[in-house]
Amino acid sequence: MKLVLIPGVILCGADVAQAVDDKNMYMHFFEEMTVYAPVPVPVNGNTHYTSESIERLPTGNGNISDLLRTNPAVRMDSTQSTSLNQGDIRPEKISIHGASPYQNAYLIDGISATNNLNPANESDASSATNISGMSQGYYLDVSLLDNVTLYDSFVPVEFGRFNGGVIDAKIKRFNADDSKVKLGYRTTRSDWLTSHIDENNKSAFNQGSSGSTYYSPDFKKNFYTLSFNQELADNFGVTAGLSRRQSDITRADYVSNDGIVAGRAQYKNVIDTALSKFTWFASDRYTHDLTLKYTGSSRDYNTSTFPQSDREMGNKSYGLAWDMDTQLAWAKLRTTVGWDHISDYTRHDHDIWYTELSCTYGDITGRCTRGGLGHISQAVDNYTFKTRLDWQKFAVGNVSHQPYFGAEYIYSDAWTERHNQSESYVINAAGKKTNHTIYLKGKGRLGIDNYTLYMADRISWRNVSLMPGVRYDYDNYLSNHNISPLFMTEWDIFANQTSMITAGYNRYYGGNILDMGLRDIRNSWTESVSGNKTLTRYQDLKTPYNDELAMGLQQK
C-alpha cells in the first residue's frame, strides 16, 4: 500500500512602486522580477521540467536521475554516488515514494524505454550467469531533451507496468523561427575537488582499489554536446542532438592481500547519445513525427584483489518511432508505431576464472584468484503499436464529460547468448581442480506478447471534478489478467484554481522482469564437473502491485 500526501504552497511577493499619471492619480505596479526556484510538485502528482528549467537546474552528469535529484518524491541510492566514486557517470538508481528502483517506467515520446532485462541487478562484479542491467533503457543526456515529466501519484491510466512512478521524456521538435546550432563543453576532474574520506577507507581510496565501491581518486570528466534545429522545407524540419560524456579513471591494477599495489591502469567510462526528430506539419489536421534515438555506454572495470580480471560492461539501445496526430471534428487521434532494441553485455578479457594457493603476479606471490568468465550478453527487441482517442468535451445537462480511450500492443523478443565457453575452478594443495564448472557456449530466445486496454473520463460539475478510469493488462509470460482501477476527485474551492484539494485511489501493477526466463536459459548451459547443477523454474507467479491512497492540497 502506497500512501501519498502532496502539499503544495506557492507564495509570491514583490516591492510595490508608485507612479503618477497625467491626472496626478497614483497607481500601483509591480517591478519586473525573475524568480529562480526548483520546479514545484503540482497537486495532481506530476512534475513537468521544461527545457528552460533543465538548463537552470544542476544536472551533474547530465542524466535523468541527476535532473530529478531535488524532487521531494524521489530518493537517490545513497551508496551509488559518494565521495569515494565521483568518477562514475552512470545514471543513479532512483526510488519514487519508497518503491523499488527497478519498478519505475521510463518512456521516450510515450513509447516504453524501460530496460526489463535485469533492472534489479546493477552489480559490476564478475559473473558467469548474471548480467548487470538498469531500469533506464536509454542513458539520455537531458540537455538534448525538450521536457521531462515525472508522474509520482495520480498516474493516468495510459501508463502501466510500474509500481513506483513514470518518467516520460520528450525529444525536441523543430521550430521554424529558431534555426540554430549549439555547441557545449563541460569538464571537471579530481584535482579540482577536495574529498573528506573516512580513515577506514582512506588507504583503499588512495590506492584506487575496489572495496565497497569502485574508488576513483584520480579522474577526469569531459562532456561534449552538439545540437541543431533546421527547417528543411515549408512545414518540414528536423532537430538533432549528439553528446559524449566520458570519464577517465586511474585505478590500481592489482592490490595483494597485504596491501601491495602492482601497477596502475586507466579505465574509461563513456556514454554516447544521438537523438533526432523529423516533423512534418502536413495540414491543420495531420502532424507526423519520425524519431530516431541511440545511446551506448561502456565502462572498464577490474577487481583490484583479482589479477587479470579486466572486463568491459555496457549497454546499447537504439530505436525509431513514427507518430501521427489526427485532428477530427469530434476528437483527437494519436497513433504510434515503434521499435526499440535494448541490450546489456559483459566481456571479460579471459575465459577461465580460477583460484590457486600459490601464484605470481609481477613481484607479488601468494594465494590469488585471477582471470575472467568470457563474453555474455542479453537483449530485447520491443515492437510497439499504440493508439489513443481523446473525445472533445461535451455536456449532459450541467455535467461535462471529457473521455479518452486507448490500446497498446508490445511484442518483446528477448534473447541471451554466451559467446564462448568459459570455466571456473579451484586448484587445491595437491594441484588438482575442484569446484570445477563449465559454462557452455549457447543462445536462447524468449517471446512475450503484451496487451493493454484503458479508458477514463473527466466528469465536471461546477468546481468539482471526478476522474474514474480503468486499465487492463495481459501478457502470455505470467498469463495474468491485471485490472487496475483509478479514481480521482478534485475540488477547486473558490473556482479560481488558487485553493485545490485532490484525493484518489489507484492500483499500479508492476512489469515483468525478463531475466527470470533468460537466466533459466543460461543455467541450462552450465555443467558442474564436481557436483550437481542447480536449475530454477518460475511458474504460477502473480504480478506485484501497489495500491495508492493519496490526498493533495495546493494553495497559490
Describe each model-derived feature in a short phrase.
Residues D22, V39-P156, V166, K170-K172, ...:
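Periplasmic N-terminal accessory/gating domains of Gram-negative outer-membrane beta-barrel systems
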Residues I64, Y102-N104, L144, D177-V181, ...:
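Outer-envelope beta-barrel architecture signal
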Residues E92, G165, K220-L226, V270-S276, ...:
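Hydrophobic, lipid-facing positions within transmembrane beta-strands of outer-membrane proteins
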Residues S135-Y138, D146-V155, G165-S227, I260-Y267:
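Short strand-turn segments of transmembrane beta-barrel domains in outer membranes
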Residues S179-K182, T213-S298, N315-L328, K332:
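Transmembrane beta-barrel wall of Gram-negative outer-membrane proteins
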Residues I197-S210, R251-A265, S304-Q308, R347-H375, ...:
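Solvent-exposed loop segments that connect transmembrane elements
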Residues L275-R299, D310-L478:
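Face-selective signature of the C-terminal outer-membrane beta-barrel domain
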Residues V380-T384, N398-S412, K441-K556:
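Structural signature of Gram-negative outer-membrane beta-barrels, strongest in the C-terminal barrel
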